[in-house]
Every structure is written in C-alpha cells, then in structure tokens.
Curated annotation (Swiss-Prot):
The keyword DNA damage applies. It catalyses: Hydrolysis of alkylated DNA, releasing 3-methyladenine, 3-methylguanine, 7-methylguanine and 7-methyladenine. GO terms for molecular function: alkylated DNA binding; alkylbase DNA N-glycosylase activity; damaged DNA binding; DNA-1,N6-ethenoadenine N-glycosylase activity; DNA-3-methyladenine glycosylase activity; DNA-7-methylguanine glycosylase activity. The gene is mag1. The record marks W150 as: Determinant for substrate specificity and/or activity. Hydrolysis of the deoxyribose N-glycosidic bond to excise 3-methyladenine or 7-methyladenine from the damaged DNA polymer formed by alkylation lesions. Can release ethylated and propylated bases from DNA in addition to 3-methyladenine. CDD domains: ENDO3c (cd00056). Its EC number is 3.2.2.21. It comes from Schizosaccharomyces pombe (strain 972 / ATCC 24843) (Fission yeast). Gene3D superfamilies: 1.10.1670.40, Hypothetical protein, domain 2. This is DNA-3-methyladenine glycosylase 1. It comes from the Eukaryota.
Amino acid sequence: MTLDIEEKEEIVTSLTKAEIHLSGLDENWKRLVKLVGNYRPNRSMEKKEPYEELIRAVASQQLHSKAANAIFNRFKSISNNGQFPTPEEIRDMDFEIMRACGFSARKIDSLKSIAEATISGLIPTKEEAERLSNEELIERLTQIKGIGRWTVEMLLIFSLNRDDVMPADDLSIRNGYRYLHRLPKIPTKMYVLKHSEICAPFRTAAAWYLWKTSKLADYTKPVRPKKH
C-alpha cells in the first residue's frame, strides 16, 4: 500500500516548515541549511509493517548493502510463498537452514525473537504503531532481544515517517554537531539531546541535515588522540 495524494501533500508541507524552522534557530543552523540545501529525506512511500522493517534492520546490521541483499534474497527464497517470510515461518524455521542463508547464530536468535514478539502482539501492526508515541514504541520494542533504541529510531524515521526523532547516540549525528558548533572533539549523547531540543518539533529534519555534514567541502574528520 502506498501513500495517497493528500498524505503526500502533508509531507511536502512538513518539509518546508522544517527548513524554515531550522533556518530561524541561529546562525549555525541557518548556514547549515543553506549549505546542504532543501530537505529531501528518504521518506517511505510504502506502508510496510513494523515486523518486516525490524526483520530487515536486524538482518542487515553490520553488513554492506550488497551482502545484506544477497542474504535477504536467499532468506525470501525459502519462504513458502517466495516473498517475505511470515512470523510463523521464521519461528518454526530450522536453525541450519537460516545459517545457510548467511545469518549468524546471534542474528537468528534475534530474528526468532522478533517473530515471537509479532505473534504475541508485542510488535504492533502499522495501524497500531501510528497511534503510539515515539517513546511508547521505543519502550515496547526495545524489550525484544537484538532491538536497541537506535534500531527503533530508524524505524520511526524511515518507516513511520515521524517528524521529531533525534538519534542522539548515532556517531554521525554527534559528528554533525561537532561540525555545526565547531567543537574540538565529538560531543556526547547528552550534549546532542540538550542542544537538539530547540529543533523540536522537527528533530528528524535536524538529524537529516547533521547526517549530511560529512559531505560538505569544509568538513574535517575528528582528530584521533595520539597513542603514547
């Protein structure tokens, strides 16, 4: 299922408001928005279920996209319908078959936990998820083995299209703040949380701009401390 015309128009309006809001915060944000350009996030136009997104997220952890796609294609090929495996299929799937797809033992454990959580109702449907707040979803989904806060934040941003999410523990975000505020070293998670409060209710847009800083001409990599 894809978004209808009215929903797409709402997204466009939200993008424009985000740019205006961030540009008006201070000179640092004004400069960053001007350098990066218009806010063009990778919004999900398909209404995929949280179960599917979480399975994909865990399956691709610590892998290059090419390797992750190869593993996932093998995984889908062993499904009864040749499409995305159902929670029941993953729950009942033989360990060695999943290993043959390329999954580590740890990932298999996590994938089966996600399947069980979907069957039990802990993982909500897309419709149910849209009625829950960001923190309610984070609290609920991080109970599942292999699912951390960052993974849920990516679900909120890229699948549920939430406008006010700041992945404060993301290293690229922290590096973005180092660039934005011209800091001598990478700031802490708490620094990001504190200084991103002014970006509400458009912290997702702020995160997008911070992610883009590494592509700017005057961006410099953080200096690593010298080994003695």
